[in-house]
Amino acid sequence: MRGEAPPDLTPEDLQRRRALTAQIEAYVRPYLARNPRVKRAVDALLRPGTSETEEIPPLKKAEADETFETFVGWDHLAFRSFDRVDGGLLAVARVFEKHGYTCEGSLTFEAKKVDARWFAPPAARWARDARGDPAFPRLFVSHLRVDDLPDDARKVIERRVGTCEESGRNAARVAERGGVPWSADGADASADVINIALDEYETLSNASEYAAWTLVHGHALNHVAVAVHRLFEHSSGVSVSMSRDSRAPRRRFASLEACLAFLKAPPLSTKTSRAGGGEVKVSPDGGLRQAATVADVLEFGFIDRSNTLEGDSRGVSEGVDARTTKTKKLVPASYVEFVDRLPIAGDAGDETNCSYAGDGGAYVPERSRRDGFETANADAIFESTFRAQQRDG
């Protein structure tokens, strides 16, 4: 994903590499299609103009098809879920564990009633680039502890998830497609076939905005994180550079702040989240620096039960009849995160393995950078899909 494959891989190893690439593409392609503001920001980094104010054209189809092999690199992919019916974070994790991903740590977000695990990509040579860096992103998967919600919100989720065979026995299969396990057929999250009632959605939104997002989007990508340290040029400002592992020029920045400034300036005018009190979230050790855009929005068709005849107590999950109507509502979709992993003190990299030396700075391998995740950072990043960020972002 981040660069050329090591030389002399066996046919079996090449097949493993292609299979994992295809799985990641299966998530990323619909993610970009559903979130036009996210795609525009990614396009700007992939195909920049010659100046910071030049209009940035959309990717042509041929260029879009190259995205997954030529982009400078995803830091991680993130998913949300409910801890129900053998689903939860394990349903998504199983999709990646079969490709060699391994769990490296757990995080707990008490106020949000959420647990998470992060997974490292395969360590095998086939999953690395020619420099030895991981060629595939980390994985961050979380789920909501449904039993910790108020009764009315818990019952909405149990009505949707707890009675659905697809969300249990076949959860991983649906997760592979980024589908909605509790819909009729694991369909595209943007389709109006899921038959979620507006009052159900609002009940969840009031109890947990994480829950409301997950009800609508299921196992779709919550966000992709760009490895900004792979964009860096060790000088001030921004310049256009030709990647060693791509025919495409790309932006390179002196800092995470410079990257954000570029994205926020016209013509992009990207909205960034300030959840947690600031735009850039920094770990206590200073080694992990993160920021995110405000989530895109998606028009979703909900069942409006406000006109249901009095005394009719049937739930939406039992079917839709002539007395119910659809109403459209804009809901938070997905966002893009930007991550800067600083070099570990005393491990600044190897000048003899310096792919960026010509740009004025030594290449620092990924193994010499701050790894993992930080609870406080992630807690704030979660809120990129919250309504307050839509208003204030």
Language-model features: locations:
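Extended, well-ordered protein cores
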Residues: 4-93, 98-393
